[in-house]
Amino acid sequence: MVEMGAMANQSQDCWLTRVQKMEKILNVPILAGPSRSSGKTLLADLEPKFEQFWRMKLTEEKIGPDNINHNKLRTYSTLKKSFSQEPYLGLVQNRTQRMHITRLRISAHNLNIEWGRYKGLAIANRVCKYCQNETNIDDELHFLNKCKTFLTSRNCFYGKFSSIDPTFKFLSENQKFERLLNPKTSQETRLTNKFIKIMFDWREKIDQGFSITNLGIYFAV
């Protein structure tokens, strides 16, 4: 804690400086002293403030020189409807059977839409290298719903998902995207998570030199 205090005094990024930043943003009140009710009092004061801050960050527009919103939460904001835990997190206790859904929801992945950010590429240049002779932006929607390279596997996945929810096939692409990343049952959660994992594994195999025509041998939804 002493070392962290020294880092904070030098304005270095650490846990303590982040706590201090949130303390300032949320205007955390100074309590008279610890008591049985102080925790409840502080929680009652901070919860609505944090929710307001969270909603502001979720919808914040960060317009760049290209007139495009560069908010990293752009995908998450289309999926997150309330300040509460998502149901799918409680439907499947095994973290590995839902982690890929979470990664795609919060943009914690290696799709070019994110890799390009760190390389300083314009969004228009963050294209999908797995599409043949096309210039599609390699974002979450394209990856999950549109990339033609994985059309056969996706159609198989869609068929299995539709057997669980027959209304799925009538949805638009954007609606399907939101539906898949907001699964309602444990079966939907595991199926979608498995497909996303397969897609990432598939892309990795292509990077290693495997032919797309032979990948069906290694992966099945």
Task: Map each language-model feature to its residues.
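Family-specific functional microsites
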Residues: 63-64, 68-221
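Extended C-terminal regions of large enzymes
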Residues: 1-112, 219-220
